[in-house]
């Protein structure tokens, strides 16, 4: 039971020699390039060899894809335009047209 509760609050990252627990609340966004992802947190960044689609399937519903290469933590969104989201008042990321309506709907309902 405790392990399940921890997994509900953290994302596990495995590198070649280390494992990290990253609290979901600290994740700003996740970006992908070259068959790997980079998890951007408030304190540091982590790299993992995994697809963006696979990561998204393991995240809570408040993580949403806003671009073909980016997943954002909707709890961190402070501003939304037709082309951009702003996270924590400073990190600006693109929003693809394909994802805009879902992002807007979630943003307005929070």
Regions found by a protein language model. Name each.
Residues 1-88, 94:
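Conserved binding/recognition cores within well-folded domains
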Residues 104-106:
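Short, surface-exposed, low-complexity cationic segments
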């Amino acid at each position: 039971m405790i392990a399940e509760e921890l997994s509900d609050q953290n994302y596990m990252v495995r590198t070649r020699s280390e494992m990290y627990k990253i609290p979901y609340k600290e994740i700003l966004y996740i970006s992908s390039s070259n068959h790997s992802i980079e998890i951007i947190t408030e304190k540091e960044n982590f790299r993992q060899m995994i697809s963006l689609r696979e990561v998204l399937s393991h995240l809570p519903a408040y993580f949403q894809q806003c671009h073909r290469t980016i997943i954002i933590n909707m709890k961190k969104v402070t501003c939304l335009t037709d082309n951009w989201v702003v996270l924590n008042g400073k990190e600006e990321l693109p929003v693809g047209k394909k994802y805009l309506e879902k992002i807007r709907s979630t943003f307005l309902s929070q």
